[in-house]
């Protein structure tokens, strides 16, 4: 597997330069664009890696999966009274759809849905930022994970559209806590710095019917695990989820930091990272690497 991963990285590396590093978040614009890493973790905990798999990066929207899992653990099925689990078909930060649907986001992975999830967790935890940090430290087995305060502050200073969504949902009665406090938590989560190895391990419970490989406890029930994987498959890559399903065929979640995590239920979790993004905001080389890996090994849920 190590040799195969290195072979795939060598195969996709010529694509460097065809994408663009996220520049609408100033603190992310400085990330060197030529970095590329991949890690695969089996359901039994065996790890394989290649390239810059241990270089930390800003996980951004990948954090929405961890937030969702925390909220499901707190609210269970009642969580879905406040948001849906359908694909959006609109840009991840659309205000038009949110107003048309009276403040109820389509799913937890568009920004409005992620803010509702953070609002739920704000009501549950006294210190949501520390609760999230400790949660991902436990899932990954890495006690050194931190949030990049420079990135979080940079995102907070450019919060206008996210704030507009939160206040709009508040106007419809679907936002219960202080908007600015929830935004602070949201950006803190997005600014968590993890590497491919951390994320491949942290997502392991989604390949094991909800059982955490690190501690052996149930993070989710088997039914809840299936639900999270299903939402990742339909909505995990914004309006490119269909293309990802077509090319890769696995549940996945991306972030504008250049990371993509994919789950092979019952078998493996994979994380690939390359900071250059395509027009849809997903890692251009990451998509190509996961497609190649899926084709070589025959991984697909379809």
From Swiss-Prot:
Its EC number is 3.5.1.2. InterPro entries: Beta-lactam/transpept-like, Glutaminase. The keyword Hydrolase applies. Signal peptide: none annotated. It is an enzyme of class 3 (hydrolase). GO terms for biological process: glutamate biosynthetic process; glutamine catabolic process. SUPFAM superfamilies: beta-lactamase/transpeptidase-like. Substrate binds at residues 61, 111, 155, 162, 186, 238, 256. It comes from the Bacteria. It holds the Pfam family Glutaminase. GO terms for molecular function: glutaminase activity. It catalyses: L-glutamine + H2O = L-glutamate + NH4(+). Keywords: Hydrolase. HAMAP family: Glutaminase (MF_00313). Belongs to the glutaminase family. Homotetramer. This is Glutaminase.
């Amino acid at each position: 597997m190590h040799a195969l991963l290195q072979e795939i990285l060598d195969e996709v590396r010529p694509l460097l330069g065809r994408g663009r590093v996220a520049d609408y978040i100033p603190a992310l614009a400085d990330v060197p664009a030529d970095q590329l890493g991949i890690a695969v973790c089996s359901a039994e905990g065996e790890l394989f890696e290649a390239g810059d798999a241990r270089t930390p990066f800003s996980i951004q929207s990948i954090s929405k999966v961890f937030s969702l899992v925390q909220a499901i653990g707190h609210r269970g099925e009642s969580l879905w009274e406040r948001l849906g689990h359908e694909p959006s078909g609109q840009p991840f930060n659309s205000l038009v759809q949110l107003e048309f649907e009276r403040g109820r986001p389509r799913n937890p992975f568009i920004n409005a849905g992620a803010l509702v999830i953070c609002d739920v967790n704000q009501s549950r935890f006294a210190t949501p930022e520390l609760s999230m940090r400790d949660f991902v430290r436990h899932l990954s087995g890495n006690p050194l994970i931190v949030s990049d305060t420079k990135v979080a502050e940079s995102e907070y200073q450019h919060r206008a559209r996210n704030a507009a969504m939160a206040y709009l949902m508040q106007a419809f009665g679907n936002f219960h806590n202080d908007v600015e406090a929830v935004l602070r938590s949201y950006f803190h989560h997005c600014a968590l710095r993890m590497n491919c190895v951390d994320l491949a391990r942290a997502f392991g419970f989604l390949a094991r019917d909800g059982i955490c490989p690190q501690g052996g406890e149930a993070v989710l029930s088997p039914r809840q695990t299936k639900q999270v994987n299903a939402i990742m498959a339909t909505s995990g890559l914004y309006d490119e989820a269909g293309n990802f399903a077509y090319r890769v065929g696995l549940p996945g979640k991306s972030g504008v930091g250049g990371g993509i995590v994919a789950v092979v239920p019952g078998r493996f979790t994979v994380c690939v990272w390359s900071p250059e993004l395509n027009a849809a905001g997903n890692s251009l080389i990451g998509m190509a690497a996961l497609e190649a890996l899926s084709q070589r090994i025959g991984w697909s849920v379809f």
